[in-house]
Amino acid sequence: MTTNPWSDPIRSFALRSFWDCYQALPEHVQKLADKQFRLFRQDPHHPSLGFSRKGEVWTAEVGGGYRALARQRGVDYYWFWIGSHEAYNKLLKRVK
């Protein structure tokens, strides 16, 4: 019997590169990121996440001024970066 991959729960993993970026963020942004990732695990399509695909990567909003990036493999998301919207715009040009 084949299982439907869309019925599997979404799994989310933060890579070392993500945690390196996270540690460099101001504490208030870290707290906001924590809140957003809890929400992502509950409902990845929640409007406040702004979760969308940009080429080969997925992006999520962390407040108005920050973004996080992930790559998808099956139903798993691997978060590899988080930072300012300005840095996101520059990085997105390279990873799309």
Predicted segments with their positions:
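Enriched for short, Lys/Arg-rich terminal
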Residues: 1-13, 62-96
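Arg/Lys-rich, positively charged N-terminal/basic patches that mediate binding to nucleic acids
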Residues: 1-35
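Amphipathic alpha-helical interface surfaces
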Residues: 18, 29, 36, 62, ...
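Tryptophan-centered motif/residue detector
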Residues: 19, 37, 58, 79-81
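Alpha-helix boundary/capping residues
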Residues: 25, 36-40, 95
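A short, surface-exposed loop/turn module that caps and links secondary-structure elements
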Residues: 35-62
